C-alpha cells in the first residue's frame, strides 16, 4: 500500500497544484467579498482544504472516465491509471473517499451550504463525461471550478445574492479561456480520438475566442468593482490581470503546444493578482477606517 502511495499522489495531481489554485482564487474572491474583507479563519481553512480535496477527487474521476482515451494522448499516456500502474476501482475509491472527507469538512456550516455542496458534487462528478456530448465542455468545467463562489456566500451570509451568480458567470468565461489554451495543446490527439473540446469547436477562431472570454471575465470584474465601490488597490490588481491576459495572447497566437501550455499555467498569476487587488482594497479600507 505504501509503495503505491506515490502513484496515488500522481493520480490526484498533488505534483501539479495549478488546478487547485485555479479553483482557489475565485473561491477566495467570494469569501473576501461576502465577508467584507474579514473571512473567519476556520471558514478559510474549510474552503481551502475542501478545494484541494475536491479538485483531487475530480482528477481521479477524470482519469477513470478518460482511461480509454488518455493512452492515445501524448501528454497523458503515462498517467498511473492509463499506464496500468493502478486499477480503475482504485481511482474510483480514492475519488469517493476524498469527496466524503470534503463533505465531512462542511458539516459545521449552515444548511444552505450543505445543499449547494450536493449540487457541486454532481457537477464535479459529471464533468469528465461532458467531453462526449457537449461541444464546449470547458463551460461546464467553469461551473464545477466556480461552485465554491455561491457556497462561500452561503457560508458567510446564509444566502446567495445575485453578485455570487455574476461572479460564477465570470468564472465560466475564465475557465473557457484557460482550458481552451489547455485544449490547444492536445488538439491533434483530440481530433484522432474523437472527443469534444472548445479548441476544436472554435476552430480557427480559437485565439479570438480565448481573448473574448478574457475580456468578458475582466469586463464583469469591472462591473463588480464599480458596483462595490472598490478603490485604487483593486483597480491595480485588475490592471495586472489585464496585462496577464494580453501576455497570454503573445503565447497562444501561433498555436504552438508548449507556449499554449505555458499560457494555461500562467493563469495562476491572473487569478492571484485579481484576488490580491480585492484583498488589498479591504485591507486598506480597514486601515483607513481605523
Swiss-Prot record:
Gene Ontology molecular function, alphabetical: 4-hydroxybenzoate polyprenyltransferase activity
Organism phylogeny: Bacteria, Pseudomonadati, Pseudomonadota, Betaproteobacteria, Burkholderiales
Biological function: Catalyzes the prenylation of para-hydroxybenzoate (PHB) with an all-trans polyprenyl group. Mediates the second step in the final reaction sequence of ubiquinone-8 (UQ-8) biosynthesis, which is the condensation of the polyisoprenoid side chain with PHB, generating the first membrane-bound Q intermediate 3-octaprenyl-4-hydroxybenzoate.
Domain of life: Bacteria
Protein's recorded name: 4-hydroxybenzoate octaprenyltransferase
Topological relation to the membrane, as annotated: Multi-pass membrane protein
Compartments (UniProt record): Cell inner membrane
One GO location term (cellular component): plasma membrane
Encoding gene, per UniProt annotation: ubiA
Catalytic activity: all-trans-octaprenyl diphosphate + 4-hydroxybenzoate = 4-hydroxy-3-(all-trans-octaprenyl)benzoate + diphosphate
One of the GO BP terms on file: ubiquinone biosynthetic process
TM helices/strands, residue ranges: 41-61, 89-109, 133-153, 158-178, 202-224, 269-289
The enzyme's E.C. designation: 2.5.1.39
Family to which this protein belongs: Belongs to the UbiA prenyltransferase family.
Cofactor(s) named in the record: Mg(2+)
The species this protein was found in: Burkholderia ambifaria (strain MC40-6)
Amino acid at each position: 500500500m505504501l509503495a503505491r502511495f506515490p502513484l496515488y499522489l500522481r493520480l490526484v495531481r498533488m505534483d501539479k497544484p495549478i488546478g487547485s489554485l485555479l479553483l482557489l482564487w475565485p473561491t477566495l474572491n467570494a469569501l473576501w467579498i461576502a465577508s467584507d474583507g474579514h473571512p473567519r479563519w476556520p471558514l478559510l481553512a474549510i474552503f481551502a482544504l475542501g478545494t484541494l480535496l475536491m479538485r483531487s477527487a475530480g482528477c481521479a474521476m477524470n482519469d477513470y472516465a478518460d482511461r480509454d482515451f488518455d493512452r492515445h494522448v501524448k501528454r497523458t499516456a503515462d498517467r498511473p491509471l492509463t499506464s496500468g500502474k493502478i486499477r480503475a476501482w482504485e481511482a474510483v475509491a480514492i475519488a469517493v473517499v476524498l469527496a466524503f472527507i470534503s463533505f465531512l469538512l462542511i458539516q459545521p456550516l449552515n444548511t444552505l451550504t450543505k445543499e449547494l455542496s450536493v449540487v457541486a458534487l454532481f457537477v464535479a462528478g459529471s464533468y469528465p463525461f461532458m467531453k462526449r456530448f457537449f461541444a464546449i465542455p470547458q463551460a461546464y468545467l467553469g461551473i464545477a471550478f466556480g461552485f465554491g463562489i455561491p457556497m462561500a456566500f452561503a457560508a458567510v451570509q446564509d444566502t446567495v445574492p445575485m453578485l455570487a451568480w455574476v461572479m460564477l458567470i465570470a468564472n465560466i468565461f475564465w475557465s473557457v479561456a484557460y482550458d481552451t489554451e489547455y485544449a490547444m495543446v492536445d488538439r491533434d490527439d483530440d481530433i484522432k480520438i474523437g472527443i469534444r473540446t472548445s479548441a476544436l469547436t472554435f476552430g480557427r477562431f480559437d485565439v479570438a475566442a480565448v481573448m473574448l472570454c478574457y475580456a468578458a471575465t475582466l469586463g464583469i470584474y469591472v462591473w463588480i468593482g464599480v458596483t462595490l465601490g472598490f478603490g485604487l488597490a483593486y483597480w491595480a490588481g485588475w490592471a495586472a490581470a489585464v496585462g496577464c491576459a494580453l501576455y497570454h495572447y503573445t503565447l497562444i497566437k501561433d498555436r504552438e503546444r508548449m507556449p499554449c501550455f505555458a499560457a494555461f499555467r500562467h493563469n495562476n498569476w491572473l487569478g492571484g493578482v485579481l484576488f490580491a487587488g480585492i484583498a488589498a482594497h479591504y485591507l486598506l479600507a480597514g486601515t483607513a477606517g481605523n
